[in-house]
Structure formats: C-alpha cells, structure tokens
Swiss-Prot record:
Residues 4-185 form the YrdC-like domain. GO terms for biological process: regulation of translational fidelity; tRNA threonylcarbamoyladenosine modification. This is Threonylcarbamoyl-AMP synthase. It comes from Pseudomonas putida (strain ATCC 47054 / DSM 6125 / CFBP 8728 / NCIMB 11950 / KT2440). Belongs to the SUA5 family. TsaC subfamily. Disulfide bonds: none annotated.
Length: 185
C-alpha cells in the first residue's frame, strides 16, 4: 500500500509539471496535468505517441468532469454514472473545452473514473489527469515497476508505488452517443 504522504508528494510534482508513473487497474500508467502543455508534450515524446491520437483523462469522481457535461442529455450522464467508478472509458464530445494536446484530432475525449485507490486519491488532490499506458510506442504496457524503470530509467519525475488492480485487460472504450464499443476490455 502506498502512503498518503507519497501520494501528496506526487500531487505536488504533478502541479509543478511532472510526468509520473503510477499503478492502475490493469497496467502501469503515465500521467501528468492535462492543462500543462509542456508536461503533456513531454509525456507524448516519452511514448513516441503522436499528439493527434488524443489521450484519456481519468478522475476520482464524475463531478471532476462536470465542466464538459453542461449541455449533455441526462441519459448520457446516467449511462456514464452507472459504469463508474470502474474499467469503462467513454468517448464524449469535448465541445472545444479541452486543449488539442489532450483531444488530438478528435471531436471527442476519452474519460474514465478509476476505481484504483491510488489513482482516486491522486485525482482527488489534483483533479483529472492524463492517463496512458506506461510503455514506449510499440512495446507492451508495463505490468511491473521493474518494467517501468527499464522503459523509462531516469526520464520520469516520480514513480508512485503500489499494486496493480488485478484486471487482466485495459478498460473497455465506448462511444457515449452511440454506445458502440470502440475497444473491448
């Protein structure tokens, strides 16, 4: 179990522009402040990931995404709420309320409310975070802290300890407007 002190340290680092690694439900994640352009571009460079692909935002609770939901139909909110917290990611219209370094070339953004205790505690302190699998492009996602260190030795500002959540696969991704599964979990 990771200490609250360590999570608070990670929160301070993120606010200062850090890129960190942390355990999630299925694999290790890389994260940073979605509003910090330099941090997001650094994360993308570490992964060799093109900015136009877009990124996932994770949160502690659905209220952290309220700024995106002002004009959403109530059934959309209910649909997301019924699956969160948990391994469900929803593609939702971003209505140009997020920067392009988060959304990429898409009219939607991927959102998830995590049920991993470390992620939830961290997001409760800093708000929504960028979350992407911890791996360089083309390599398998890190499932151990050792693999995180092998992939990114000395390139991350902090590696937040803790155990993975026990899921075998990443979250399912669905389109909120259609309900269509874009990526099986």
């Amino acid at each position: 179990m990771v200490s609250s002190f360590r999570v608070q340290q990670a929160a301070r680092e993120i606010r200062a522009g850090a890129v960190i690694a942390y355990p999630t439900e299925a694999v290790w994640g890389l994260g940073c402040d979605p509003w910090n352009e330099d941090a997001v571009y650094r994360l993308l460079a570490l992964k060799s990931r093109p900015v136009d692909k877009g990124l996932i935002l994770i949160a502690d609770n659905i209220r952290q995404f309220d700024f995106l939901f002002e004009d959403f139909p109530e059934d959309w909110i209910d649909r997301m709420s019924s699956t969160w917290p948990g391994p469900n990611t929803w593609l939702v219209p971003h209505q140009d309320l997020l920067p392009e370094w988060v959304t990429g070339q898409h009219d939607t953004v991927a959102l998830r409310v995590s049920d991993h205790p470390v992620v939830r505690e961290l997001c409760a302190l800093v708000g929504p975070l960028i979350s992407t699998s911890c791996n360089p492009g083309g390599r398998p996602a890190a499932k151990t802290r050792l693999r995180v260190e092998q992939y990114f030795h000395g390139q991350l500002d902090l590696v937040l300890g803790g155990a993975l959540g026990g899921r075998k696969n990443p979250s399912v991704i669905r389109d909120l407007a259609t309900g269509e599964v874009v990526r099986p979990g």
